[in-house]
Amino acid sequence: MYLDDAALDGGERMSMRVRRPGVRDGYDAWSTTYDETPNPLVALDRRYTMRLLEPRPSERILDAGCGTGAYLRLILLAGSSPFGLDFSRGMLRVARRRLPSVPLAQANLDDPLPVRGWVFDAVLCALVGEHLENVSLLFREFSASLVAGGRLIFSVFHPEMAAAGIEANFEREGVEYRLGARRYSVDDYVDAVDRSGFRGLRVHEFCGDAALADEIPWAAKYLSRPLLLTVEARKT
Ligand SMILES: C[S@@+](CC[C@H](N)C(=O)[O-])C[C@H]1O[C@@H](n2cnc3c(N)ncnc32)[C@H](O)[C@@H]1O
């Protein structure tokens, strides 16, 4: 879920305890219920990001920050060969159970990627960026792992939301767990891609809309507010 305090009514806010477990421990804890948690950002991302990725048969596609494997599954269904990385053992456990044939590895995207010897036709990195310390390293590593002309599809929680103090969170047994969101700007992401050996950048900003509010009624407060940023590019 991505919420701000305004999502909770006064009574709930008063009684809810808040914990900040850190990003990795937070996703480990969230992993068992992540796929069932109504989440406007994820819903919007699901609407656009696969369309941008357009996986083709036989392509090798890296899903960096693959979580529970929602995109790994769709990539596999398209006849491509996915490879998933994530640093949360809990999220990887769910992905492995769901997709036993897909290669997965535990990796911190703030470090050099453990994919030397692999080369990919496309890299997807969906809804991870605001958790990362070093996005410049990330895009350089993506560039190094792509074939010439290979595609990058990057989607992220819109910086305006993070700037408004909204962050990834979930609730369990009267406790709200907050996972944090770094305050990057749109330009921080776009410039880092641009400096990392990519060309043909296309940037899109997607706002909450009526269809999203139909799907998740409390997301009506995001009507016309930018929720999702995507950057597409090709390796030079
Ligand atoms: C919001 S989930 C998105 C998962 C998936 N991409 C999706 O669209 O469902 C964010 C994921 O990023 C992972 N993550 C966050 N920081 C990370 C890091 N530094 N290195 C690797 N994975 C990270 C989390 O473990 C989690 O699985």
Model-derived features: positions:
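Class I SAM-dependent methyltransferase SAM/SAH-binding core
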Residues: 62-64, 68-111
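A short acidic, Gly/Pro-enriched loop at the edge of an enzyme's catalytic core
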Residues: 114-123
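A short SAM/SAH-binding and catalytic strip from SAM-dependent methyltransferases
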Residues: 122-135
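Short alpha-helix
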Residues: 181-204
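Conserved Class I S-adenosyl-L-methionine
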Residues: 200-236
